[in-house]
């Protein structure tokens, strides 16, 4: 996992990001409305100059070391079932800190086979947090290393089904019907 800090203290945030290559992202994804328009909040590069106290204190933010990536990976765990989807963007879009900020027509999705040990670790991690469902995000580095970024206990999955055909909804229904975890 990259170096990570969650804070709403400007001094702590500035000290943490220092001279390094860091990103900032919302603790809760979403967006906001202004003048009748909806805006998304994406992960963005950040420097100490971006973090005056008054801009940081209103809500906690996740600050994380930026990791070079070959592609992103969303791993959805439902009970004992694991679905992994590779999320790729063209090299000329790699300057974006968040693939969601890239033109959706340029984002490619495909089913990804996890190493068995990582798949088992994902299931164990979800269970250790007393969850039956969770979405785990990883970055795959240019060297092929898997770097865990975060776990989301209410991660979206419909878009992955649409893009790859993975049967996440069926797995959730099975879990609900059987009570299996």
What annotation goes with each model-predicted range?
Residues 110-116, 120, 124-131, 140-181:
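C-terminal active-site "lid" helix and adjoining low-complexity regulatory extension at the edge
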Residues 3, 61-62, 133-136:
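A short linear hydrophobic-aromatic micro-motif
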Residues 10-12, 17-114:
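Phosphate-binding site of ATP-dependent enzymes
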Residues 1-2, 22:
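Hydrophobic anchor at the start of a short beta-strand
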Residues 3-7, 11:
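FMN-binding flavodoxin-like domain, especially the glycine-rich phosphate-binding loop
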Residues 23, 135, 148:
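Generic enzyme active-site microenvironment
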């Amino acid at each position: 996992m990259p170096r990570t800090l969650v804070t709403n203290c400007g001094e702590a945030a500035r000290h943490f990001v220092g001279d390094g290559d860091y990103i900032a992202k919302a603790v809760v994804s979403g967006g906001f409305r202004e003048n009748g328009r909806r805006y998304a909040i994406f992960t963005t590069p950040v420097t100490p100059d971006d973090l005056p106290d008054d801009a940081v204190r209103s809500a906690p933010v996740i600050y994380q070391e930026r990791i070079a990536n070959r592609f992103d990976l969303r791993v959805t765990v439902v009970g004992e079932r694991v679905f992994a989807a590779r999320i790729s963007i063209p090299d000329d879009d790699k300057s974006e800190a968040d693939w969601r900020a890239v033109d959706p027509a340029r984002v490619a999705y495909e089913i990804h086979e996890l190493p068995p040990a990582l798949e088992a670790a994902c299931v164990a991690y979800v269970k250790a947090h007393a969850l039956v469902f969770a979405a785990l995000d990883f970055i795959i580095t240019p060297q092929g290393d898997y770097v865990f970024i975060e776990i989301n206990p209410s991660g979206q999955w419909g878009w992955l089904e649409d893009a790859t055909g993975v049967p996440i909804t069926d797995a959730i229904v099975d879990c609900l019907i059987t009570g299996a975890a």
